[in-house]
Amino acid sequence: MNNLADTVVVDPGFGGGDKQQQAGPAPQDASVVVPPPATKQSSALKKTSRYRSRSLSASSTDSFSSASYTGSSEDGDDVPPREKVQKNSKGSSDFCVRNIGAQHAFGRREIEIAEQEMPGIIALKKRAAEDKPLKDAKIVGCTHINAQTAVLIETLVELGASVRWAACNIYSTQNEVAAALAESGIPIFAWRGETEEDFWWCIDRCVNAENWQPNMILDDGGDATHLMLKKYPTMFKLVKGIVEESVTGVHRLYQLSKAGKLTVPAMNVNDSVTKTKFDNLYSCKESILDSLKRSTDVMFGGKQVVVCGYGDVGKGCAQALKGQGCIVYITEIDPICALQASMDGFRVVKLNEVIRNVDIVVTATGNKNVVVREHMDKMKSGCIVCNMGHSNTEIDVNGLRTPDLTWEKVRSQVDHIIWPEGKYIILLAEGRLVNLSCSSIPSFAVSITSATQALALIELFNAPPGRYKSDVYLLPKKMDEYVASLHLPTFDAHLTELSDEQAKYMGLNKAGPFKPNYYRY
């Protein structure tokens, strides 16, 4: 393997396939209804004209539309952020956001609202702020930019870190939150609707800054790690540790380790118990319904749905949809997960067996080409297709960018793909993360993950030389338990304490950890 691209999954944040993005039609202003041309419409256009007219004209006030969530994220400012000269109230221009002046106050309120539902990360900030465990840490962050991650970013700063931040997804940034962070003095380079060039430029501005050299990476998808290793290998060797929170990013790290190219220790947060059992499961259980409802106003009762993948994300999606009265099918490659799905009451099928009849397709695998053009050719008209995995490669969107198909944007993050005979499918967020592109995610679940990320950064940064080698590690069990304990007061939950006799009988320390590393919760 001669180059990094051979050893990693292709760009999960932006995706190599997005190089053809300009082939699609230009987005229409959501507040304007464009009169139809005086030509004969296809049957699909006739069937959906009423839906499109309502969504185009009313999306700004519709309580379930994505516009109602993004707020000022869709501000209609056509001037590219990189061409603007902006300064915050302190005179700093070390940032690049959509519009700091018009949005930062609203973004600050969003962050304050999120803090109320994030007790764990706030408790950690209060307990550790005086000790400054991240003093002298210089962290490059590449994650989703929303109110919840803003709470994490400001917590890291409060714990002593210097940070620079970019987005890991071109559609998930809340512009008003990015503006609020910029106003508070945090160097942030992110806005909703970045191009591919913008995406990599933003990460580069974070990594390669004047008089500032990163020594830690907090990644979601592996893009900051990928760029730094490929473009700044000497700088990469000076990094003390990497913290990665996504399936795709962890996969890339293991590939680098296997190829002998991972020269720094990395912490796999994605497979920590507090991430998989709470964020992946409970967060996805709520956000999949919110995403579909906001973007399509779909009625769930009686709908046939296929969920591709029955890991923790797939489990959450399937259980939520089943609870709303959907008939849910599961596709799986793993016999253990397939058996779990079967015993949970779901029918496990191959995608081709049900693709002609289902109303909704949800991917949650972290793999590529799970739903390809052949499948979409067989879908019935009006089928909704969306992705809950990290990567934008699960749905073969490039296979839909052909001359015989027509793309029509009907809402922010909602496209109709129309076949010559009039059939159409509804593609959400162009195959990217639907819950972060079309809705929001529960702040409480993100608090658990954020506290886990913060502790992982503290552990790697303060670890004595030799404790961690150039490999990928799981978060120590003791830290998982500590993160959980930070959130128990919210429920007025009281833990039972072991007696000395009980602790001796079980061979445990009374303060934990209480389960071995191989225990499956």
From Swiss-Prot:
UniProt note: phenotype after gene disruption: RNAi-mediated knockdown results in extended lifespan with increased fecundity and suppression of age-related decreased climbing activity and intestinal integrity. Does not affect oxidative stress resistance. Decreases levels of S-adenosyl-homocysteine and homocysteine. Suppresses histone H3K4 trimethylation. RNAi-mediated knockdown in neurons results in extended life span. RNAi-mediated knockdown in the fat body does not show any phenotype. Simultaneous knockdown of AhcyL2 in intestine results in extended life span.
Keyword Repressor (UniProt): no
Pfam families registered for this protein in UniProt: AdoHcyase (PF05221), AdoHcyase_NAD (PF00670)
Highest taxon above the source species: Eukaryota
Cofactors: NAD(+)
GO biological process, one term: S-adenosylmethionine cycle
Region listing for Disordered, in residue ranges: 1-92
InterPro entries the record matches: Adenosylhomocyst_ase-like_sf (IPR042172), Adenosylhomocysteinase-like (IPR000043), Ado_hCys_hydrolase_NAD-bd (IPR015878), NAD(P)-bd_dom_sf (IPR036291), S-Ado-L-homoCys_hydrolase_CS (IPR020082)
Subunit structure: Interacts with Ahcy; the interaction may negatively regulate Ahcy catalytic activity.
Function: Might play a role in the regulation of methionine metabolism possibly by binding and inactivating Ahcy.
Family: Belongs to the adenosylhomocysteinase family.
UniProt-recorded name of the protein: Adenosylhomocysteinase-like 1
Annotated organism of origin: Drosophila melanogaster
Gene, per the UniProt record: AhcyL1
